Design a protein with these regions (language model features):
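Active-site acidic catalytic loop and adjacent metal/ATP-binding pocket
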Residues: 72-118
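Short, charged, low-complexity patches
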Residues: 4, 8-12, 115, 129, ...
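All-alpha amphipathic helical-bundle segments outside canonical DNA-binding/catalytic cores
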Residues: 148-158
Length: 213
């Protein structure tokens, strides 16, 4: 179930505990969440390996260039916070429930800002996301302090996730299992929808950020 319907505060407590432990030392062999690694490298791989259809390439190239420039601005504004050891892919599908929330699937763990483990738990209209955030942070701060400046990163992180996921699939496309498992990928329709989603993100980056009351 989504955290808005079940225990957002409890999930917040679990993540606060995770980050409190994660802040005690650093990863030695895991990646760091960066604009260069998740955004620029993803864009370059897709363009250099001709995944984008010719008729869509100019739009994708220009749009992603503008997005990454905008994201880099936002990133610099928030670049003075600690990098924590994170779950990295914390969404409702990676939370099991027993007596409380149980995080699973740590294969995407990496170093980055705390908000990376929180933003995917928010959904719905702005008022709903605001309420979910308040519940999450209320539980989170029982164990670890949250820097509200990181809320500026939410739409930047959403954009990087979109770009990184496309490149993740593309890098594995020579594996016969992937075209069978993801038949919708690497079609003109897929790339048209990606461009539309990225255009929406360019607008979202200029919208007011969520706030803690």
């Amino acid at each position: 179930q989504h955290p808005r319907t079940r225990g957002a505060r409890s999930i917040g407590r679990t993540l606060g505990q995770l980050h409190s432990i994660g802040a005690r030392s650093r990863f030695q062999h895991r990646p760091r969440l960066t604009v260069a690694g998740h955004g620029e490298a993803s864009r370059r791989f897709l363009l250099d390996n001709d995944f984008i259809p010719d008729e869509l390439r100019p739009a994708y190239e220009t749009l992603t260039r503008d997005l990454l420039a905008r994201i880099a601005q936002v990133w610099r504004m928030c670049d003075n916070g600690p990098l924590l050891r994170l779950h990295g892919d914390c969404h409702a599908g990676n939370i099991l429930w027993r007596e409380g929330p149980l995080l699973v699937d740590f294969d995407d763990c990496l170093a980055g800002p705390a908000i990376q483990d929180l933003w995917m738990l928010l959904s719905g209209e702005r008022a709903q996301r605001q309420a979910q955030l308040a519940e999450l942070i209320d539980g989170y701060e029982m164990f670890y302090d949250f820097n509200p400046a990181e809320l500026q990163l939410v739409e930047a992180l959403r954009t990087l996730r979109l770009m990184h996921y496309s490149a993740w699939l593309a890098r594995r496309w020579d594996d016969p299992a992937f075209p069978r498992a993801f038949p919708w990928f690497n079609t003109p329709r897929y790339w048209s929808e990606q461009i539309l989603a990225l255009r929406e993100q360019l607008a979202a980056l200029d919208e007011p950020t969520l706030r803690l009351f």
